[in-house]
């Protein structure tokens, strides 16, 4: 049986990346919450 998780960096960044988060109001809210928690990585695309 084929596994469900087939990793793709491009798809990952397009759905969860920084620019995608910044594009919507809710995405910006997520980033603000992560900043408030002092997360070192705000999104999956940030190094």
UniProtKB/Swiss-Prot annotation:
PROSITE patterns: RIBOSOMAL_L34 (PS00784)
Full protein name: Large ribosomal subunit protein bL34
UniProt organism field: Buchnera aphidicola subsp. Schizaphis graminum (strain Sg)
Family of this protein: Belongs to the bacterial ribosomal protein bL34 family.
GO molecular function: structural constituent of ribosome
Keywords of the record: Ribonucleoprotein, Ribosomal protein
Gene Ontology CC: ribonucleoprotein complex; ribosome
Record keyword RNA-binding present: no
Superkingdom of origin: Bacteria
Keyword Ribosomal protein tagged: yes
One biological process term in Gene Ontology: translation
Pfam families (UniProt xref): Ribosomal_L34
HAMAP family: Ribosomal_bL34
Stored InterPro entries: Ribosomal_bL34, Ribosomal_bL34_CS
